[in-house]
Amino acid sequence: MIYAVFFEERAAKELARIDKPYQLLIKKKIEQLTENFDSMVNNLKPLKGKYDYYRLRVGSYRVIFHKDSRKIIISIVRIGHRKSIYKDFD
């Protein structure tokens, strides 16, 4: 099942601030995620206290997203370094 991807405005800005090599790697991982969600389970972890929110690990960076299985949509909520990504995520 192929998911559609939607970047929230904040996530798009955060991605633009990351160095180009990591941007390309993050985009590649997101593409793999949309094409075959089940094959990425080793890099995914559900967020505690947040239903249908997950984090995707890409090196030192994390991609936080919401998966809507009914509409087959993945909404990218936040992208950032692992040290700071969770600080103001609510």
Where are the predicted features?
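Arg/Lys-rich, positively charged N-terminal/basic patches that mediate binding to nucleic acids
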Residues: 1-29
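Enriched for short, Lys/Arg-rich terminal
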Residues: 2-4, 9, 13, 58, ...
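Conserved short hydrophobic interaction patches
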Residues: 29-32, 82
